[in-house]
Curated annotation (Swiss-Prot):
GO biological process, one term: protein insertion into membrane
HAMAP family for the chain: YidC_type1
GO CC, alphabetical: plasma membrane
The organism's place on the tree of life at top rank: Bacteria
Membrane topology term: Multi-pass membrane protein
MF terms in GO: membrane insertase activity
Family matches, as Gene3D superfamilies: 2.70.98.90
Organism (species): Actinobacillus pleuropneumoniae serotype 3 (strain JL03)
Positions of transmembrane segments: 7-27, 338-358, 417-437, 455-475, 494-514
Stated name of the protein: Membrane protein insertase YidC
Gene (name only): yidC
Length: 542
């Protein structure tokens, strides 16, 4: 029985330590001011360099100037395009506010103190993105807005050189963060034209600032035919450049709840690359050479995703793009849990209630394991007098003691691990729930009731963590404790306090789950102990 309780304590401490360690990496508030000061102090230059074509060693030089900007706006997305090169230099997510209760949209792509842009163009023999500079596209007007009743908007930008007409078209769709970026090359000459498409994302090579609501991790990722999903951090980029030839795939720049990604033609052979240069990290792709015969034309397609980690829409955009919602090793549990969470939310229309609903469902499913755990622990308690007698009888003869204990367990039909296995089974589920709540952009700025207006942020008044600690204390008092070792007793007594401190700065959605879980456990434990009392396996007297 002592070993069961010790295992429970060690397991909870281990899970808490792992979660708290990860949280410190993602949410460390102490470095926020320092990192933000670094970002503000360094003004990154807007780099216009593009990748070299296949079998070329040159790198395109930076442009000293920019063209004018053009704004494209749908119901959920506003893009700012630089006509010099046709790069996306800003993206505003109109359905996501920058801060709670703010009317300012969240800005994903941006320029200024830091660079975070999505570039694309054409290199190669007749490419217009060269060492001489970037193309200055012409566009009909400065602002384009998706009209009411219109589901799609196409905005062409044109550039003509040496008898070849290049048209770069952006296609925005209603309710979508998936933007089609297509090149049409119309060869009006008597010579063959060869171009090679590319798309890349550039980001100022600085550690991201941490906060309580936004984690510090920002880095690259890619997908290839061989690897469904692979993170490639800025540190990885500084150590070695990516150079992967693959069919299909994509490249991306990840933040906590948001992602920008280039998705090339999935039927073509592409090269995925990365590099760092002048304080800028770049991850991108280069497509195959496209040959356009005289007096003919060709269209090269690609997609740009710049928006929240919407799993359903990302999955429809490109294979494995939804894996940027990173559940870690517990993904096979977290995915169905997230599906359950969204299903319940569609009924109750409140994410806090959905968390409570998921907790109830999970605890109900696990109830047989919980009952088996408490029953096994109760049977072990009943054997404690006999076990103590054996210890006194056999003393230091551990082999004989072990043999007699195994014999006793067999006669009494008690599994000494019966109280441990249910605990071990439930731990991965808790970890999966943790990542589900931490990765769900749906919880960002999602209100519950009263003072909880953002389930992704800490409780501003620490009420939920304190209630959670109180529920742990009550649960501990309800549980029979045969522990006699003073050190173990102190650890057990200190656990509710320690957990309360851990959870003071955790997202309120996660604390709400733990509090609900404790309350359900208290009810289940009361029911189980009442049943055990009837069987003579439990007594309320301690």
């Amino acid at each position: 029985m002592n070993s069961n309780r010790s295992l429970l304590v060690m397991g909870l401490l281990l899970v808490s330590f792992l979660i708290f360690t990860q949280w410190q990496q993602d949410f460390n508030p102490e470095i926020q001011a320092q990192k933000q000061a670094q970002q503000q102090a360094q003004v990154a230059s807007q780099s216009g360099d593009v990748p070299a074509a296949s079998n070329a060693n040159t790198v395109i030089a930076e442009n000293a100037t920019q063209g004018k900007t053009v704004t494209l706006e749908s119901d959920v997305l506003r893009l700012t395009i630089d006509t010099l090169g046709g790069d996306v230099i800003a993206s505003d997510l109109l359905a996501h506010n920058a801060e709670l209760n703010s009317q300012t949209p969240f800005k994903l792509l941006q320029t200024g103190a830091t660079t975070y842009v999505a570039q694309s163009g054409l290199v190669g023999k007749n490419g217009i993105d060269t060492n001489a500079g970037r193309p200055q596209y012409q566009v009909a007007q400065d602002t384009f807005v998706l009209a009411e009743g219109q589901n799609e908007m196409s905005v062409p930008m044109t550039f003509e050189k040496d008898g070849v007409l290049y048209t770069k078209t952006f296609v925005l769709k209603r309710g979508s963060y998936d933007v089609a970026v297509n090149f049409n090359v119309k060869n009006q000459t008597a010579a063959t034209v060869e171009v090679q498409p590319y798309g890349q994302i550039k980001y100022t090579l600085l550690e991201s600032s941490g906060s309580l609501t936004m984690p510090t991790y920002t880095g690259g990722a890619y997908s290839s035919a061989e690897t469904n999903y692979k993170k490639y951090s800025f540190q990885d980029m500084e150590k070695a450049n990516l150079d992967i030839n693959t069919k299909a795939g994509w490249v991306a720049l990840l933040q906590h709840y948001f992602v920008s990604a280039w998705v090339p033609n999935q039927d073509a052979e592409n090269t995925i690359y990365s590099r760092t240069n002048n304080g800028i990290a770049t991850i991108g792709y280069r497509g195959p050479v496209t040959t356009i015969a005289p007096n003919s034309e060709a269209t090269i397609t690609s997609q740009l995703w710049t928006g929240p980690k919407d799993q359903k829409e990302m999955e429809a955009t490109a294979a494995n793009l939804d894996l940027t919602v990173d559940y870690g090793w517990a993904w096979f549990i977290a995915k169905p849990l997230f599906a359950l969470l969204t299903f319940i939310q569609s009924i109750v229309t409140n994410w806090g209630l959905a968390i409570i609903g998921v907790t109830i469902v999970v605890k109900t499913i696990l109830y047989p394991l919980t009952k088996a755990q408490y029953t096994s622990m109760a049977r072990m308690r009943m054997l404690q007098p006999k076990i103590q007698e054996m210890r006194e009888r056999f003393g230091d003869d551990r082999q004989r003691m072990s043999q007699e204990m195994m014999k006793l367990y067999k006669e009494e039909k008690v599994n000494p691990m019966g109280g441990c296995l249910p605990i071990l089974i439930q731990m991965p589920i808790f970890i999966a729930l943790y990542w589900t709540f931490m990765e769900a952009v749906e919880l960002r700025h999602a209100p519950f009731f009263g003072w909880i207006q953002d389930l992704s942020a800490q409780d501003p008044y620490y009420i939920l963590p304190l209630l959670m600690g109180a529920s742990m204390f009550l649960l501990q008092k309800m549980s029979p404790s045969p522990v006699t070792d003073p050190v173990q007793q102190k650890v057990m007594t200190f656990m509710p306090v320690m957990f309360t401190v851990f959870f003071l700065w955790f997202p309120s959605g996660l604390v709400l789950y733990w509090l609900t879980s404790n309350i359900i456990t208290i009810v289940q434990q009361w029911l189980i102990y009442r049943n055990l009392e009837k069987k003579g396996l439990h007594s309320r007297k301690k």
